[in-house]
Amino acid sequence: MKNVIVWMILTVWSIMNVTAGDTVYLFSYFINNSKDGLHLAYSYDGLTWTALNGGRSFLTPTVGKDKLMRDPSICQAPDGTFHMVWTSSWTDRIIGYASSRDLIHWSEQKAIPVMMNEPAAHNCWAPELFYDESSQTYYIFWATTIPGRHKEVPTSESEKGLNHRIYYV
């Protein structure tokens, strides 16, 4: 149940408001097990969604062992720049990063080594990016498994051996 609640919260946080005449919701997502890249959809009501770019990817992943672009999280900075982080591999200690002024043309992709100080870290999954206006600080939260560090609480057969905990920078 806790996993479902966390998933729902992270999904809602992934939706952001963009103003360009009318207010719309923008949703970033992945398809085909995330090797395809960044996909975007919009909605006026949060219920009916339309894929942008004909459903094609806006950005193909180039960083990480597996070159994935899973769980993309986009945040708009006060200067209008969009910053994005994503899961870049199944078993890497990095997350991907890129920025854009228009959500179409993206900067060179970079690997952020968020768990390099933890040699036993198994992964860095589902990063979420936030900007706190009061402190003018960006925060990135993600889930990582460090075998033997925390009690294992598998919620399904596929979760065996994983003990994800939330970390942030």
Where are the model-predicted features located?
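Bacterial N-terminal signal peptides
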Residues: V6-I15
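Carbohydrate-active catalytic/glycan-binding domains of CAZyme proteins
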Residues: V18-V169
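Positively charged n-region of N-terminal signal peptides that target proteins for export
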Residues: M1-V4
